[in-house]
Design a protein with these regions (language model features):
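Long, low-complexity, intrinsically disordered polar/charged segments
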Residues: 1-10, 83-97
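Polysaccharide-binding and catalytic clefts of secreted carbohydrate-active enzymes
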Residues: 1-56, 62-68
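Surface-exposed amphipathic alpha-helices with a cationic face
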Residues: 20-31, 80-90, 143
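Generic recognition of flexible, low-complexity loop/linker segments
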Residues: 23, 48-50, 78-81, 110-111
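N-terminal cationic-hydrophobic initiation segments that often serve targeting/anchoring roles
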Residues: 24, 54, 83, 114-115
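Substrate-binding cleft of secreted/luminal carbohydrate-active enzymes
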Residues: 56-79, 88-168
């Protein structure tokens, strides 16, 4: 019988998948993994066999961190690709540690664009609760942004900001 050798990529993917499987065995509730933002070459670059790992998880967590989202097409494109590629739900994370009005405006418009995708959730990474309030207050008090949401049909964002307006 001829011995079959695994390629480096196959061996690494099996090793990572086994690690995820072992970790899942230790978890009693929902189980998710955070994956690097490369939906195309995840196996080759990181040893992630997304189909095999998808059989083990309840959802995938995809962080798309950035210092700002002034140019947001990359975040929308990657999010769309992950939703299309993965066979489990996707939870997207964006960075919200944005102290300037311009950065908050770009962040919230990016959230609006990705909210049109079939994501389970969009998480905003913040430093503290004041940072969270800053994001919400900016959205509530910025009539131009709220008008932009309405003009371009971002009904879900309008609903969310209207809810924030009851608190802020």
């Amino acid at each position: 019988m001829e011995e079959k050798w695994l390629t480096w990529t196959e061996w690494r993917a099996q090793t990572v998948t086994k690690f995820v499987s072992d970790a899942k065995a230790l978890v009693k509730g929902k189980f998710a993994v955070e994956i690097y933002p490369d939906p195309v070459l995840s196996k080759e670059r990181f040893g992630l066999d997304l189909d095999a790992i998808g059989d083990l998880v309840d959802y995938f967590h995809v962080p798309l961190s950035s210092r700002d989202y002034f140019t947001n097409y990359w975040a929308v494109t990657l999010a769309r690709d992950f939703v299309a590629l993965l066979k489990k739900p996707v939870v997207l994370e964006l960075s919200a540690e944005m102290p300037t009005d311009e950065k908050l405006d770009a962040l919230l418009k990016t959230v609006a664009y990705v909210s049109r995708l079939k994501l389970d959730a969009v998480l905003l990474l913040v430093h503290d609760s004041e940072n969270t309030r800053q994001v919400c207050r900016f959205a509530v008090q910025n009539q131009n942004l709220r008008d932009w949401f309405k003009k371009y049909g971002f009904d879900e964002m309008t609903r969310i900001v209207d809810g924030w307006a009851k608190l802020y």
